[in-house]
Amino acid sequence: MKAEILCVGTELLLGDIVNTNAQYISKELANMGIEVYHHSVIGDNEDRLLKELERAFNYCDLVITTGGLGPTKDDLTKESVAKFFQEDLILHEKSLKQIEKRLSCFNKSMTESNKKQAYFPKNCEILENPNGTAPGFIIEKDNKIAVILPGPPYEMQPMFENKVIPYLEKLTNSTIKSKVLRITGIGESDVADLISDILENQTNPTVAPYAKQGETTLRITAKANSEEKALSLIVPIEKKIRQILGTNIYGSGETSLEEVVANMLVKRNLTIATAESCTGGLLAGKLISFPGISSVFLEGAITYSNESKINRLNVKKETLEKYTAVSKEVALEMAEGIAKSAGTNIGISTTGVAGPSGGTYDKPIGLIYIGLYINGKTSVKELNYSGSRQFIRNITVTRALDFLRKNLI
């Protein structure tokens, strides 16, 4: 089955709202083994929407739309879809009562505009919306399937999970399961090279690498006539990949790197403090986003100037004068200094040149040092990156977390 995702709303075209719906639906369809061929965003215009539907159904079996189901005159998705399928819109009494009941919860009465939301194509399956006043619907005609969903993610996602996924699973006549492995420390091209035999000889399951800033994900997808069989097909491929990539795999599913590191610290009761220069608190921010980290995260210091490194972290003045602030020697003294000052098992530091200015021939933009102190033992990691200031700072945080993780394994 081939699919297109069509997101409707002038606010999306203007950039007022980020289109997270397409990303979410694509991931869910990929989990089901449904190929997404195209994403489209279109304004609230009936003529353009009709043309997009005609174009999409020229090569797709399934079109999923989000948005344009509201009560205002420019919410035209329902009308456009009905016209495309040559269906009349009729009032659905049950939906009308549900909308009226929901409005009453907010001390609002039914208006003619709201009543519009209770009209649907005559031959469709209506999708109830317990989180809003815009029900969705599914219409199937002439081997074409349109799934029409509301725009707000808090309305769309539950509807997709509870109604659309079961509907689509019945159409596929098979069970599709996926397992996502999360990798950091090596790039997508290196991952692809290391598992090239698997990628070149894949059938069922399939293995697909995806890159994002600082990490790579591998999605293993298997299709079978039962969930148990599909999961059993994934096991040997996952085992082989883990043997090849080893500790570069930090987790699976939706697990984040900071969550993995925080769990390691909490489970082992290892206290930690951070000393940051170029990352300016980003590393501490990542760690404290994890619930329960307060039991082990004692302190975070932003020591941007040389004076603060000396006064706060006890970095030696002569070390700074001899090696400069961007050096492995200073990174190590920063990590040890914050650990001893805070009385923690672990101290971790970042120092570097994030740019866009400040680089020299010996200390170019993108040169980063990460210092680590763990119960008396110290180590340091040197990094070299190019890119924007924000990219360099963010990638430094990812590498620092991974450096800590690998030293705790």
Curated annotation (Swiss-Prot):
CDD domains referenced in this protein's UniProt entry, alphabetically: cinA
Pfam family, one: CinA
SUPFAM superfamilies with a match to the protein in the record: CinA-like, Molybdenum cofactor biosynthesis proteins
Disulfide bonds: none
Domain of life: Bacteria
Family to which the UniProt record says this protein belongs: Belongs to the CinA family.
HAMAP family given in the database record: CinA_B
Protein name: Putative competence-damage inducible protein
Species, as recorded: Clostridium botulinum (strain Loch Maree / Type A3)
